[in-house]
Amino acid sequence: ETLEQFGYHQYEISNFAKDGYICRHNMKYWTGDEYLSFGPCAASDFAGKRFTIAPDIEKYMDGVLNKGAILSECETVPMRERAGEYLMLRLRTVDGVEEGEYTKSFLLPFEPLEEVFQKLAKQDLCKNVSGRWRLTPKGFMLSNSIIVLLLEQQQKSKPLTQKK
C-alpha cells in the first residue's frame, strides 16, 4: 500500500516499479522467454536447451581460443517440466496464466487446472481477469502452496494428442 501511494505498482510477487520501469531482464525468466548469456559461468535457455558456460576462466579462455568446449552443463528440458515452470513463474507475475497459451505451448489440458483455480477463487486466492488466472494479494501470500496444488494436478494430466 505504501509503495502504491508513491506510484509504484506490483508487477511480480516481490517486485514493484513505476510505470515503464519494470525489470525487463527478470521478466524474461518469469515469462519463460529464451535468453542467451555470455562469458564464464553464464547461464542460457535457448532452443529448448538450458546450458551453462564453464565457470573456470582458464577453461573458458582455452575453449574460446582453441575452439574447444566451453559448456559445463547442457540439458534438454522436458515439455512437462517446462509446463510446470510456466505455472510457477507466471503465477509470480500479476499477469498470471492463460488457458490457450498453456494448452498450445505444452499440449496439456487446462481443465484440471481450471478446477483448482475455481476452488481457489472461492477463497479469494485468485481471480480470472480477461481469460487469465491471476493470484490475488492474498494468493500471493500463499503462492508456494497454491503452486504446489497446481503442479500436483498438472502431473496427473495426460498430454493432448494434437494442438488446439
Where on the chain are the PLM-derived regions?
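Minor-groove-contacting beta-hairpin "wing" of winged helix-turn-helix DNA-binding domains
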Residues: R132-T136
